[in-house]
Amino acid sequence: MRMEKTTDKPLSAGDMNDEYSRGPIDDIDCLNFFERAVQDPCCEACDTEDADEELRAKLSSFNFQPDSSPCNAKCQQTLNPLCKIDEALPAESELAPSRNGSVSEANSDTNSIASTVHDPVDSKYGGMPSLRKAKTTSYFTSSSSNNTTMRNPLKKCNTNINGLLVNGRSSSSSRQSIPELFSGACTKKKNNVLLKSETPNSEFSSNSLQHCNSRSFSLPRSRSRSSAIAIPTHLYGLEKYVSPGLDTLTADPEESIERFSNNRPREISSCCPNDTGDTSSSLSHSNTSSSLNFPLGTNTNQFHQPRQPVQQQQSSKPNFGAGRKKSFIEMSLASSFAG
């Protein structure tokens, strides 16, 4: 009876086919079918049992009669009926002949193909392998377009620089100050370069100067301070001391040296020598400013006029910078001119 079967051994594929042919499977047979690998987990035959059965079925239908081809002996030696399916087809089967050809023809064809592809000494390829690196095209399709695109920004830069240089040369010839040159640039916001035809306004008010300073323009007061021609005065800051009042030091050097040695600021002798000592003493104690404090725009002819009374000169001199102390540069200049 079926109940007397032992469940220790797993059922083979043939037994399972017999069970299917007999009729419906009982519960115990179902358990035996699903518990085959559980009963003996260390057995490898459970995994390859079905594959071996299929291989035996194929080998039973295979024709083992000898063939006329010389490759048949090699194929029979390598074909093992007990080996697995993956090992049944060796690597040498790639050279198997076709139905209409022979092995020698196939070997000759493969050798010719290999010689044409892998022959490094062939003169056709110049002694180099047939593989070549693909040429990569640049971003620009033509060289002319690349050159034009690279030259256009250079031309723009050159035109801007040339415009600035021309404006700098034209302004250096004249006596205009830099604030006057920037008046056109402050009013015209869109254009960065002054054109040749544009002439800036001669009148430059303080309001426009403050407007330019608010737009982070550091503008000097005079042209001599920022120009490259007047380098000594720009470096040492002596342009405000270069005035017609320095001529008075050459007119009367002895009296000016005495006054500088006594540390008496705001006291410089007049350009004309006096006959009486009373007038010179009264002039020394006066509160009038020295001739060094005159602005740049004063008239220089008043120092070269003929002798006049001291009272007239004292009334004609304006009182500029009465409370300013003389600097070391003024004293050194006075001593250098006096010597």
From Swiss-Prot:
Keyword Phosphoprotein set for record: yes
Keywords: Mitochondrion, Phosphoprotein, Stress response
CC annotations in GO: mitochondrion
Mitochondrion as UniProt keyword: yes
Induction: Expression is induced in the late growth phase and is negatively controlled by the cAMP-dependent protein kinase A (PKA).
Region annotation Disordered: where it falls in the sequence: 1-20, 94-156, 198-224, 258-325
Subcellular location per the Swiss-Prot or TrEMBL entry: Mitochondrion
InterPro entries, A to Z: Mbr1
Compositional bias of kind Low complexity: 136-149, 214-224, 279-293, 302-314
GO biological process, one term: aerobic respiration
Modification sites for Phosphoserine: 177, 224, 227
Transmembrane segments: none
Biased composition (Polar residues): 99-115, 198-213
Modification sites for Phosphothreonine: 159
Function: Participates in mitochondrial biogenesis and stress response.
Similarity remark: Belongs to the ISF1/MBR1 family.
Record protein name field: Mitochondrial biogenesis regulation protein 1
Species assigned in the record: Saccharomyces cerevisiae (strain ATCC 204508 / S288c) (Baker's yeast)
